Swiss-Prot record:
CDD domains the UniProt entry points to: RlmH-like
InterPro entries: Alpha/beta_knot_MTases, RlmH-like, tRNA_m1G_MTases_N
EC numbers for this chain: 2.1.1.177
Similarity comment: Belongs to the RNA methyltransferase RlmH family.
Gene Ontology molecular function: rRNA (pseudouridine-N3-)-methyltransferase activity
Any one annotated GO CC term: cytoplasm
Protein's UniProt keywords contain Cell membrane: no
UniProt protein name: Ribosomal RNA large subunit methyltransferase H
Reaction(s) this enzyme catalyzes, per UniProt: pseudouridine(1915) in 23S rRNA + S-adenosyl-L-methionine = N(3)-methylpseudouridine(1915) in 23S rRNA + S-adenosyl-L-homocysteine + H(+)
UniProt subunit comment: Homodimer.
């Protein structure tokens, strides 16, 4: 199985890099895992709606350029469907069973995802209604992917 997370922007915080590196190492036993960073679009503090949309479109084009036709795409969206860890694990296992071995998760930039990226999505997921920094979300998502494999393996890690 190939799993990738496509994210907008660079990760700077050392403690987040260390956490992601730990889970990436653990994931290597179950899948080929990678995080792909695409550049964020530089924008002034206050933007009109049209300017915000332009930023999302440019970032969206970069994201879409990293998605392959065969990829099953989960986008992280505020209005996405909330899932438990068990539900995400079952969904990933079902995808693998039915031949979807290339899974991509997408975390947008600070303004969110473009309409084109959301349209490409096979499934929109949400980690709740609260807002998390995009950098922290990388770690949370990476841990949940690892947890999904642990649930499938019947490991006590999930308890």
């Amino acid at each position: 199985m190939n799993i990738k997370i496509i994210v907008v922007g660079k990760l700077k915080e050392k403690y987040l890099k260390q956490g992601i590196a730990e889970y990436s190492k653990r994931l290597s036993k179950f899948c080929k895992f990678q995080i792909i960073e695409v550049p964020d679009e530089k924008a002034p503090e206050s933007l009109s709606d049209a300017q915000m949309n332009e930023v999302k479109v440019k970032e969206g084009e970069r994201i879409l350029g990293k998605i392959k036709d065969r990829d099953y795409v989960f986008t992280l969206e505020i209005k996405g469907k909330e899932r438990s860890s068990e539900e995400l694990s079952a969904e990933m296992a079902k995808l693998a069973t039915y031949g979807n071995s290339d899974i991509t998760f997408v975390i947008g930039g600070s303004l969110g995802l473009s309409d084109a990226v959301m349209k490409r999505s096979n499934s929109a997921i949400s980690f709740g209604r609260f807002t998390l920094p995009h950098q922290l979300m990388r770690l949370v998502l990476t841990e949940q992917i690892y947890r999904s494999f642990m649930i499938q393996a019947g490991s006590p890690y999930h308890k």
